[in-house]
Amino acid sequence: MSPAQTQWTSVGPDGGDARAFAAVPGQPQHLYLGTVNSWIYESSDGGTSWRRLSRLSASDDLVIDHIVVDPRNPARIYAAAWVVDHPDGGLWLSLDGGRTWAEVSALHGQSIRSFAIAPENPDLLFAGTLQGVFRSADAGASWTQISPAGSREIHEVESLAIDPADPDTIYAGTWHLPWKTTDGGKTWHNIKKGVIDDSDVFSIIIDPAQPKIVYASACSGIYKSLSAGEAFRRIQGIPSTARRTRILRQDPQHPETVYAGTTEGLYKTTDAGHTFHLMTSDDVIVNDVSIDPADSDHILLATDRGGVLASTDGAKSFAASNTGFSERKVEALIVDANDPHRLYAGVVNDKSYGGAFVSSNGGAGWKQIADGLGGRDVFVLAQAADGTLLAGTNSGIFGLPPDSSSWQPRSTIANTLVKTATETLKGTRVHIEKRVKDQLRQMDGRVFAIDLSGDSWLAATTGGIYTSRDQGATWQGGPVLGVAGYLSVTSHSSLMAAARPDGVVLSKDGGQTWWPMSIPTVLTRIHRVAFSSDGTLWLGAREGVYFTRNNGKTWMWAQRVPIVDIDDLYYDAASNRVLVSSRSSDFVYAMDPATLDWKWWQTGYKLSAVRAAGDRLLAASLYDGVLIEPRAAVAELGRK
């Protein structure tokens, strides 16, 4: 690997979506953690800290919901995965403790929703897929479907459980109802007595000491059977809004204690299901529960948005345990104008766990600064000359002064309208134009870009282009030339430019008036515009990088730079270079605006933006937090 291909380092912010745990048998402090983007993490201290271990495949869309460690050989690990938006996934095998993986060809393309290993025979493996139930008797070397092929009932198998006393007894929960076989899959029968019809069965567990006791969770509630599933009764105590119980987990030391991880918090029963109590806030979405077999007071939760939560007191209290774990979708990234070690990041999809973050040590540690944002997504960050931060969100603009700890709305639209009135002067009717203030209103759509470099501040939003001459206290504007959705803005001296997907407009009077620019006819979608210090306007589009040095009279294509589908284009004034990246690529390109010479780096991650911090580059990734260029990385020169 060349220095330019040295993988960049993810430095946070910690947290994000965590999916599934696996503990090494006999080594409860040694854990693995699956994610929604093909990565697996490892912990050697019981989940106190994590390190990014490996990626199952080059794709970044595998949801890893099941990791199983062979109890005979801890270096042998299985990882089962599926893909969110289409039927795909598979099974991967590692023989070196998770450092490298090979796909199991027999299950290639199978969307594996459940996976289990026989408690008394580790050679027996079971996979529940969208097609049905599959079984391997040789530790995954070969697989056979044991549910009826083409069955209209036993498919979309979300949960599996194997009787610890009899591996031929298998429970399968589908998106419709639970099923059972007692002969290794030769025959199946529905076990729906007591279960509300059309119940998605998310999790099934069997009491290892009393296998006739079976718990099942469904969208209609939690059920318990005392007859090996032949009859169920619904357990009371879980609110109807929290009945999407994704995981059930029994305390190995106290079988009367069962944890239920729901979409509205963690519930716990200590009396075998007679009563349940909420142990977390109801905004916690629980995907998995891990109970330390050596210390059942030590509990880990894999959650959406909040990452890993840890308890050392039997779930009475939880705290984040995400050191080294970062699965954040970072959309905004800026470096403090006066301190290159101070970084700000804006994330999306994490609601109250997201918003904005600050690092004062170059990414080594992060602090959430989201008070006042109300769980909004942050798509853009900008810093004013006085240090005030502006955040463009999915619902307006917010400001954070240097001496404040809470964001305040800065989204007031105060337009002035020109109205024509008819009056009679000295017997003659004349038309008089009057300027009147429009009713104040608030921006309520997404803010795509903010530029604070000129005398007037500039914002691109779903509602159009807005300018402010009072540091964001009020904004003026709206649709420009009859079009509202603008994605990017930039300013240089008295010039302003704004881009929408199919065009660019230019203003020479601080945004009072706009006129359309001529653009190359080959362009089908524009994402970004930026001025360099010499007044050149750069344009990032689906077809590549284009630029004009005469306000659109003529355009040139920077065809030597081998990148298309450009999503971010940024002028780095300190180094006089144009930085370019794409969400469909892990490459970063830097171009000299005068000579058009270019360099490249390969980061190893899909990117949403690239910025400079002193002598190093930073990147906002699509799924893996903020990335930092390693000291060893040396850019490769591009071909001329």
Residue ranges and their predicted role:
Residues 83-88, 153, 197, 241, ...:
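Short, solvent-exposed loop/turn segments at conserved positions within beta-propeller repeat blades
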Residues 43-44, 71, 94-95, 119, ...:
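Conserved Ser/Thr-centered positions that define the repeating blades of beta-propeller domains
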Residues 11-24, 57-70, 106-120, 147-165, ...:
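Short coil-to-beta transitions that initiate beta-strands within beta-rich domains
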Residues 2-40, 51-52, 288-294, 298-312, ...:
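An edge-strand/N-cap motif at the start of beta-rich repeat modules
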Residues 604-640:
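Blade-level signature of beta-propeller repeat domains, shared across WD40, Kelch, NHL, RCC1
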Residues 39-42, 89-93, 132-135, 177-180, ...:
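A short loop-to-beta-strand structural motif that recurs across blades of beta-propeller domains
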Residues 36, 82-84, 130, 175, ...:
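Short loop/turn segments immediately following the C-termini of beta-strands
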Residues 28-29, 74-75, 122-123, 167-168, ...:
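Short coil/turn segments that connect the beta-strands within blades of beta-propeller domains
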